[in-house]
Amino acid sequence: MLLTLKNTGQLLVAACSKVARSLAKYHPRVNHHRHCVWCSKRGLTTGGTAQKQDILFHLCQQRHFLSGETLTCTSLVQGCHNLGPLGVELKRNLVAQWWNSVVVYREQVLGIDTLHHLSTPSSAPEKPLLAICTQHLKELPRDQLVKWLEDPAGKLEFLRHELLYGALLEYVPSMELLNKKMPFGLAEIGKCFHSIPEERNKGTILPRIGERTVASLVWFSSPKSSGQWQDYWLRQRLQWWQKFAQSPSGFSCNDIQDGQGRKSSLIQYEFPWGRETIETLCNMDDSALFQMHPGCTTKLQARDGRKSVVPHVVWVSGDLDRGILAYLSDALQQTEAPAVRGQYHQREVLKLHPTLAPIKVAVDMGKGPTGELRLVCQGLSSELREQGVYVWPGYQETLHGSLEQLYTKYDKMGVLFTVLVSESTLENGLLQVRSRDTTLKETIHVSKVKDFLVRYIAAAGNL
């Protein structure tokens, strides 16, 4: 049989199906978790929620938080979109907050970083994504290709669907580092991949691939305390998600049970189009470790006081890309803008939490000698950047509108403060600082602006 690009794709589909059948017995707990995360029912409501959804998608594209040919709730949830510059900064801030909360501020959690591809299918999804070189397949003789198709699982690597596998693999060396003392956790943030449901791939040979950034904590504790730890981490994680929200009630928790009666907890957010799972917590007892390390009971034992036992696993897995969507949806508010020619209208404000807002300060200049004002703006921006403050250089823009148009644009970008340098700044050192949340304008001396803004941002992080 002559291999072409088309029939090579068909052969890959056949191989994937064969691998899927051979892996059906593996990791039912992981498959149950996956079903909880990706198969939620969505029904778009009409009226205000539908309007908010349209406004949200338009704003995210207009202000470059998200990008893609067409943004829909399905494409966003399935991970088929890109992040624009502001989305990247928002994500970077969210990742930093997660890492600080789970790793930096705790004594018993270690960070790890594992490979994107798996060498064993023990935690592969029901329809695994295989890492295959099609050129190599096309060069294989027919007899070798047939032999490969008969048993592909042992000769391939799989793109990871979850981060659990890497943590279980790193359990033994990490336990040795901690002198085999429990409890402890392994945390990781990384990309994971999944196939798009078949109804989205009609007319195509190979399935589309979606991706998401997953934040995972795998917690190892004694069997007798694993249930308490699961409850503890559920409280911690729900409080963490609610901490940065304008409306904390948008995040909620629901408990479910798998076929074996084991409890899992879902942290969900109420989007305009329906409820979606943001994070999942489940107690996997000791079966996950035994599946990863068969026949190694002694090697898996850790110290629980004077006893040595195989720990139970509590797994926390969060989708940070959905978290970004949740906070964008939560932050979007409509306020009444000042009247223009006697007409009032609504304008959008993105009230992101100060620690998550991608741009903290925008520096602009008003009327006056352009060259001198630009030098003041550049100096102030440099001072703020040295303090780790992300500054938007509005003074470099060549197209200038009214101040209200400027404030409207920055409100949609979620900018916390707008600093306006004007001719009076050159005369007496005073400039104007406008707050996104209150719309109040305060006059501050240029020498005190940096300390004022840095203190505010630092204080917001401690709320």
UniProtKB/Swiss-Prot annotation:
Gene3D superfamilies: Anticodon-binding domain, Bira Bifunctional Protein, Domain 2. InterPro entries: aa-tRNA-synth_II/BPL/LPL, Anticodon-bd, Anticodon-bd_dom_sf, Gly-tRNA_synthase/POLG2, GlyRS-like_core, POLG2_C. SUPFAM superfamilies: Class II aaRS ABD-related, Class II aaRS and biotin synthetases. It comes from the Eukaryota. It is found in: Mitochondrion. Disulfide bonds: none annotated. One of its GO terms (cellular component) is mitochondrion. Mitochondrial polymerase processivity subunit. It regulates the polymerase and exonuclease activities promoting processive DNA synthesis. Binds to ss-DNA. Heterotrimer composed of a catalytic subunit and a homodimer of accessory subunits. This is DNA polymerase subunit gamma-2, mitochondrial. The gene is polg2.
